Amino acid sequence: MMTNVETVVNTHNGNGAIATKIGETQTDVAALLERLAALEQRVNELESAPGQDIEDRLSMVVFSGDLDKAIAAFIIATGAAAMGMEVSMFFTFWGLNIIKKQKTYEGKNVLEKGFTAMLPAGTGQLPLSQMNFFGAGAKIIRKLMNDHEVTSIEEFVEMAQEFGVRMTACDMSRELLGVRDEELIDGLEFGGVASFMGDAARSKASLFI
C-alpha cells in the first residue's frame, strides 16, 4: 500500500518537474525571439539610415609633401579612377605643396612670407622622404623615371584631373600656412575636414598618405 502511495507521489512530483522545465524552456524561447526581433529592427534601422550607403569610392588624405609619397598617392588615385571608382583627394598641411603652381608674397604677414619662402612652390621643388641629399635625390629619381618612361608627378596630376578625381585643398591649412588661391593649380575645390569625412563615410577605402 505504501508502495502505491510512493508511486503516486513520485509520479506527481515528476509531472511537476516536467511542467516546470517546459515553462522555463518556453520563457527562454520567448526571450530569444524578443532579442531576435530587436536585432532585426536594429539592422533595418542601420540599413535605412541616411549617409550609410557604401559606394564604389576611394577617399584619400594627402598630408605629406614628399615627391615619392605624392607619386604613390597619384598612382593609386588614377588607378582607382581608371577602374571606375569615384576618387577624392584631400590635401592638407605639407600636401598643399603638391598642388601649388607658384609663390606670391603680396598681402602676406611676416610669418606667412616666411612659410612661403621655405616651402616648395610646386611639384618641381618637392623633396624625397628618404635620401634627398639637399635636392639631389629628387633630381636623380626624376631622371630615373624619365629614363624608364615612367609618368612624372606633373603628368599624374593632369591625368587625375582628366579622370575626374576630386581634389580639395584644406581651408584650415591654407589659412595657417598663408597659401593663397592664386598660388594653387586650377580645378580645385576648397573645404574643411567635414568635406573629407562626408566622402570617407561612403567610401570602400580611405587612405592617409
Ranges and model annotations:
Residues 71-89:
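Histidine-anchored nucleotide/phosphate-binding helix
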Residues 169, 174, 182-185, 189-209:
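Glycine-rich, aromatic-bearing surface loops/beta-hairpins
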Residues 107-145, 149:
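A glycine-rich helix N-cap at a beta->alpha junction
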Residues 99-108:
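Glycine-rich loop at the start of a catalytic domain that most often binds anionic cofactors/ligands
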Residues 60-71, 144-148:
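Short, glycine-rich nucleotide/cofactor-binding loops
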Residues 154-163, 168:
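A short aromatic-anchored loop/beta-hairpin motif
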Residues 87-93, 168-171:
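Short internal beta-strands
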Residues 14-55:
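Long, leucine- and charge-enriched amphipathic alpha-helices
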